[in-house]
A protein has these predicted regions:
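Short N-terminal helix/helix-N-cap motif within the alpha/beta-hydrolase-1
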Residues: 99-105, 122-123, 178
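Short acidic/polar active-site loop segments enriched in Thr and Asp
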Residues: 32, 166, 199
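PLP-dependent aminotransferase-like
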Residues: 91-92, 109-170, 180-184, 188-191, ...
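Short helix-capping segments at alpha-helix termini
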Residues: 84-88, 194-199
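Flexible low-complexity scaffold tracts in large eukaryotic assembly proteins
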Residues: 172-175
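Glycine/Thr-rich phosphate-binding loops of Rossmann-like dinucleotide-binding domains
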Residues: 44-46, 104, 128, 177-178
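N-terminal small-domain helix-loop-helix segment of the aminotransferase-like
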Residues: 2-99, 106
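Conserved small/polar residues in nucleotide/adenosyl-binding loops
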Residues: 203-204
Length: 204
């Protein structure tokens, strides 16, 4: 008997993890496999990061942290964004999480109600539609092929928006294609969203 909630039964297993498992099985059989599934770094954690983690544990820096993250960490991120990326974000505008997947899911759960539509340009990160379904929303997939550098146009966005549209998930650089929207392209999409007060853009 299936005792899981209807919400969970709407979800599909992760295609990424399924591919990774299949890759591991083939490798165990001696097959030469190039695994393009999980985005695993091909280098080890740098020594100075390992040392900092060990030092933190030795100094008992392992209690519950403030919800948005330690102030010193948020200040360091703010400085990094300004010095390396030319972006001005105050520490109070920065929230630290366990990773992008948690942040995206939190945002969707905070914004989407049952029946709301979320526009997702394709190709997309496989977790996006499942997160929308978990929030009882409806993923709306907008295809963007190689002929348009895997980027949706303002015209495509306009055509996809309905009275039920709640959000657009925009990933730039794209996972998995690596395509990057220019400032002008983003401005074009923003102009469309500005005409629809209920729709918000979540940039990952």
């Amino acid at each position: 008997m299936n005792q899981l909630s209807d919400r969970l039964n709407r979800l599909s297993p992760s295609a990424t993890l399924a591919m990774s498992q299949k890759s591991s099985e083939l490798k165990a059989q001696g097959v030469d496999v190039i695994n393009l599934s999980v985005g695993e770094p091909d280098f080890n954690t740098p020594d100075h990061i390992k040392a900092a983690a060990v030092k933190a544990v030795e100094e008992n820096y392992s209690r519950y942290s403030p919800v948005p993250g330690y102030p010193a960490l948020r200040e360091a991120i703010s400085a990094k964004l300004k010095n390396e990326n030319g972006l001005d974000y105050a520490p109070a505008q920065i929230l630290c999480s366990n990773g992008a997947k948690q942040s995206v899911c939190n945002a969707i759960m905070a914004l989407v109600n049952a029946g709301d539509e979320v526009i997702i340009p394709a190709p997309y990160w496989v977790s996006y539609p499942q997160m929308v379904k978990l929030a009882e929303g409806e993923p709306v997939i907008v295809e963007a092929g190689i002929e348009q550098d895997f980027k949706i146009t303002p015209e495509q966005l306009e055509a996809a928006i309905t009275p039920k549209t709640r959000a657009l998930i925009l990933c730039s650089p794209s996972n998995p294609t690596g395509s990057v929207y220019s400032k002008e392209e983003l401005a074009g999409l923003a102009r469309i969203l500005a005409q629809h007060e209920r729709a918000v853009s979540y940039t990952h």
